[in-house]
Amino acid sequence: VEIVDLSNNVADRQLITPEMFSNIENEKTDLLLIKTGYGIYRGSDHYTLTPPGLSSKLAVYFREHLPKLRCVGVDLISISSYSNREEGRKAHHAFLNPDDGKSILLIEDMKLDTNGPFDKVIVAPLLIDHADGAPCTVFAYTDS
């Protein structure tokens, strides 16, 4: 589990790009949690209307630099910024339905108000037939 704190590096409506992850090269990372700091706005228009979003280029970058990555979690309502819907659609497709490579699962709207470290993370989704998404509960804990 790797946690990247971008809370001092992102602004409203900004695209989160591969350059922001140039210092992460842990080939063992299977879960990447991206903390933007926008969780403090949960329940407000600011949280839903002005958050940053993930660039579609991140999916390719993560596949190249984090070969064991299976899942990305964010403290944003969606990886798609409300103000940049087309790029958001591309990002969802790039992560979940890549033309080549494996899917990288997404967990959106996470509560990431701690910095870890975590030894184990359990993701328990509500399984719904023929759905392209579902609510899930995430448990994170440390052995120490």
Show the residue positions of the predicted features:
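Active-/binding-site microenvironments in catalytic and ligand-binding cores
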Residues: V1-S144
